[in-house]
Design a protein with these regions (language model features):
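Conserved phosphate-binding/catalytic loops in two-lobed NTP-binding clefts
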Residues: 196-209, 375
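Phosphate-binding loop and its immediate beta->loop->alpha context
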Residues: 27-194, 205, 276-319, 330-368
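Conserved phosphate-binding catalytic cores of ATP/NTP-utilizing and phosphoryl-transfer enzymes
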Residues: 203-235, 394, 401-404
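Gly/Thr-rich phosphate-binding beta-strand-loop-beta motif of the actin/hexokinase/Hsp70
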Residues: 1-22, 219-260
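Glycine-rich phosphate-binding loops at beta-strand->alpha-helix junctions
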Residues: 173-188, 324-330, 336, 374-381, ...
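Flexible phosphate/Mg2+-sensing switch loops adjacent to catalytic phosphate-binding sites
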Residues: 19-28, 36-61, 217, 224-228, ...
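Extended, hydrophobic alpha-helical segments in both membrane/secreted and soluble proteins
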Residues: 185, 189, 193, 207-210, ...
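Short beta-alpha connecting loops at secondary-structure transitions
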Residues: 258-269, 286-291, 370
Length: 427
């Protein structure tokens, strides 16, 4: 069995030998008991990719980005892969993964990012070549569905090179999607997999996948770990979306019984929004004219890298961010600014995770904030969206909690599972 987390920012692959799989817990939502069955060994699959011109190496994560090279930008040997790769987007000069991310942070207007968010955007033709968004006419374009397919095709090629006798298209493949993806977005995800040469797969909602992971890590001690908890909140904040799920916990014959009782609406709010906030802050410090779409995309990649450095252990106090010009202005048109660690903590914690009361609701505006054509949530405060979600599901939550619900108080989950890269920073 092969599990693929096709993320907005990164893609990761894990696998287990089904021959050692005696049994496994059924997904929450099917009224299943989290049975303590013998667990197979789970392995991460290091994904070979270009990490620099002419250099291929295996990495635990594949950045979910692609870069469309200009003619003559790199020599053919610099982008040669150790396998045959046919781009589903039919762009002859595309590179994927770490090298794509590195080039996109240096050259504006050629990076395709957040394809997963575009798959869920009903306001555009997701089969049309529209990415990179706002790029110049002479730059090759790709559709959101083809971009997503290209990451899966890259994984398939790397897998088949390592396991030629167990090709990926013949394995049991599970692909994760946000719980809030509608039927159209799920259908497009399946179509992207088909374009990548993976016609047979199952979709698994990301909060359920997080529960699977938790159950696996607490194998044999699930009852003890959950204690007397009766209501589990899964808060999954990824690169492009925030998924909120409520799961009722009931005593079972041998292990607790987990049933999904609430799913939040599709919320385009995650790490991308945080990077955009940082980019807009840096843009205001650069001086000069407002950045165009290509320059802002370049700045986003630099801010994402700076954010990760500034929130890591032993982080520096400040990190430089530079926006290069295009064409003949590549060096002469460069503009630089700095981001401080305190800047990042203040903008992200106070802006996206402020302390709020249980009665607060998201601030409504006329429409969602549109950047790069994507309809981001108008209110960036995840905690306010969480408060509204819990208020919406107050009745079922109170029933799930039973006598553990406090009289006269809003019902609150007594167990929380946090998932997503946002919660992994050392800060």
């Amino acid at each position: 069995m092969v599990g693929i987390d096709l993320g907005t920012t990164h893609t990761v692959v894990a696998y287990a030998d089904l021959k050692t799989l005696a049994a496994s817990p059924l997904p929450p939502g099917e009224g299943s008991e989290a049975r303590a069955a013998p667990s197979p060994a789970i392995h991460l699959f290091p994904i070979e990719q270009l990490i620099a011109p002419g250099a291929v190496a295996a990495r635990p994560l594949l950045p979910s980005v692609r870069y469309h090279l200009a003619e003559g930008e790199l020599a053919p040997g610099d982008v040669q892969l150790p396998w045959s790769f046919a781009d589903p987007g039919e762009v002859a000069n595309a590179v994927l993964g770490e090298l794509a991310r590195e080039r996109g942070a240096r050259v504006p207007g050629r990076l395709v990012a957040s394809a997963k968010s575009w798959l869920s955007h009903a306001g555009v033709d997701r089969t049309a070549p529209i990415l990179p968004w706002g790029a110049a006419e002479e730059i090759s374009k790709v559709s959101p569905i083809a971009a997503s397919a290209s990451y899966l095709a890259c994984i398939k090629a790397a897998w088949n090179r390592r396991f030629p006798r167990q090709p990926l298209e013949r394995q049991e493949v599970v692909l994760t999607v946000p719980a809030s993806f509608d039927e159209a977005a799920r259908t497009l995800t399946v179509e992207a997999a088909r374009l990548a040469g993976l016609p047979q797969l199952r979709l698994l909602e990301e909060p359920q996948a997080a529960c699977y992971d938790w159950l696996h890590r607490h194998h044999g001690e699930i009852t003890t770990a959950l204690g007397e908890s009766r209501l589990l909140l899964v808060c999954d904040v990824g690169g492009g979306t925030t998924d909120l799920t409520l799961i009722q916990i009931e005593p079972g014959e041998s292990e607790p019984r987990l049933t999904r009782i609430g799913v939040g609406e599709h919320l385009m709010l995650g790490g991308d929004n945080m990077d955009l906030t940082l980019a807009r802050t840096v843009e205001s410090r650069l001086g000069g004219n407002r950045l165009n779409a290509g320059e802002l995309s370049q700045l986003l990649q630099q801010c994402r890298s700076a954010k990760e450095r500034l929130l890591a252990e032993d982080a520096p106090e400040r990190a430089p961010v530079t926006v290069l010009g295009g064409g003949a202005r590549l060096i002469g048109g460069a503009r630089s600014a700095e981001l401080g660690r305190d800047d990042v903590l203040s903008l992200l914690v106070d802006g996206f995770l402020p302390q709020v009361g249980p009665g607060e609701i998201p601030q409504s505006r006329r429409a969602a904030v549109v950047e790069f054509g994507l309809p981001y949530a108008a209110d960036p405060a995840i905690s306010r969206h969480l408060a509204a979600f819990l208020a919406q599901h107050a009745e079922v939550s109170r029933r799930a909690l039973g006598e553990r619900a406090l009289p006269g108080c809003p019902p609150m989950p007594d167990a929380v599972l946090l998932n997503g890269g946002v919660f992994h920073g050392a800060a």
